[in-house]
Amino acid sequence: MTEPLLEMRGVKLEGRSDETWNPIINGVDLTLARGEVLGLIGESGAGKSTLGLAAMGFTRDGVRISEGSVEFDGIDLLKASASVKRGLLGKRIAYVAQSAAASFNPAHRLIDQHVEGPTQHGVMSKAESEADGIELYRKLRLPDPENIGFRYPHQVSGGQLQRAMTAMAMACRPDLIIFDEPTTALDVTTQIEVLASIRDIVEQFNTAAIYITHDLAVVAQMADRIKVLLKGDEVETADTRTMLSAPTQDYTKSLWAVRSFERPLKSPVVASAVPVVSVQNISAAYGRVPVLHDVSFDMHEGRTVAVVGELSLIHI
């Protein structure tokens, strides 16, 4: 049997409140093989992101790993020195955050930030890393891959920036990547495109990945196995097909039921005869670029109008 790349045993984490340490993660086990994607799913506060950081041997300020072990390719990350961890992070272990915009320096071009990791770790020269960056942009389906890296972060869309961050994480060809809800802020269409490109590149490089999310649709597309967390406890773990078709625990079943909209819907409010707000035939432009074309809608008392559209469309 192949040895796991990542193995976490009995991991407990605590958070400090005043002088008291309170439990956050209550003895979770986790194994991950090369090329495998594990989905970590649970509601807000379940401990997903905290466990994801612990998988790299790190914690946020005010959090500690109080029990358990974390081994990456035979290296005990909880006993490893700071220099050993620095050598691993970015080169063999990478992290993709929820906010791509916050992860980039707005004063530097995308490609300049992309080459930092490979050159600092001695993986490639600057020229080699720039050429490889273009190839990664192409694999991640970024438009105009030869030139998009010469733009600044504010000059690309949210979905493009998220893929550029994934390219940066893959630059050193890490063995393990932690994806911490990287598509949460994206619209559905862009999210599907980004997820497909991430899944493709992870498979191409046989990279192990932990994908953290609260979205069942996302985890169904990304994960080979799913681990469900609730308030720091592991609820159940199974391969994706089994988890989606035949969950065993009541909490997991309730998550699936919510996603399936099995709850009764509210009865619609009867619209008032006269709308509170009436917008008719609105058109708008940024300079010479039209952005709204003959838009009309009414808003009635007690009712809500939802405006839905992709990123870069103009919402009223």
Regions found by a protein language model. Give the residues of each.
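A short, surface-exposed alpha-helical micro-motif characterized by mixed small hydrophobic
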Residues: 219-221
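Conserved small/polar residues in nucleotide/adenosyl-binding loops
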Residues: 314-316
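ABC ATPase NBD coupling module
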Residues: 64, 76-94, 112, 120, ...
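A short, proline-enriched helix->beta-strand linker immediately N-terminal to the Walker B motif
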Residues: 171-175
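Conserved ABC transporter NBD signature motif
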Residues: 64-76, 309
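Conserved structural motif at the start of ABC-family nucleotide-binding domains
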Residues: 6, 25-27, 277, 292
